[in-house]
């Protein structure tokens, strides 16, 4: 048995949603609160991971379904390695692919899937990275939820539907309460 497998398994909190949904914002707040309570937590962000794993890819700029799937499975494998070392992993990633959701449920210890469901109209209004503006201008393609089909999670452990005025603090409280209720943290 490998040394990784001798530890008590950790857990993976997988926060998914379209670009601009607030995944990273929520993840950072959840991580801060968990760390404040004494948990050892690793924060992973899909944008950072794309740079790390994509650096060895043939086409770093590709956002095709195939490229997204390959990267998301790599992210999931990294989460598993970390969770097998008794760590809590919080990951913020689009990864709206049924193959990823299924793989995660089957292979990640303490897996808890969060889906931030935000209408495209609201995402276009927020557009923190200019993705929706650039898509509308014809500058980019393969935008999840627009010209690239997504698979909404069918069995997310928690779905946070957009509500005007709902703050990240409120979302964080709701998520942490759900994690406690499900005995994830």
Language model regions located:
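Phosphate-binding P-loop
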Residues: 4-10
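Hydrophobic anchor at the beta1->P-loop junction of P-loop NTPases
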Residues: 15
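Walker A (P-loop) phosphate-binding loop of P-loop NTPases
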Residues: 20
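Conserved lysine of the Walker
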Residues: 23
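Conserved substrate/cofactor phosphate-moiety recognition/catalytic segment
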Residues: 28-77
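Glycine-rich phosphate-binding loop used to anchor ATP phosphates in small-molecule kinases
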Residues: 64-112, 133
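Conserved phosphate-donor/acceptor-positioning beta-strand/loop module used by diverse small-molecule
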Residues: 90-92, 107-126, 160
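Small-molecule kinase domains that catalyze NTP-dependent phosphoryl transfer to phosphate-bearing small molecules
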Residues: 117, 125-174, 181-185
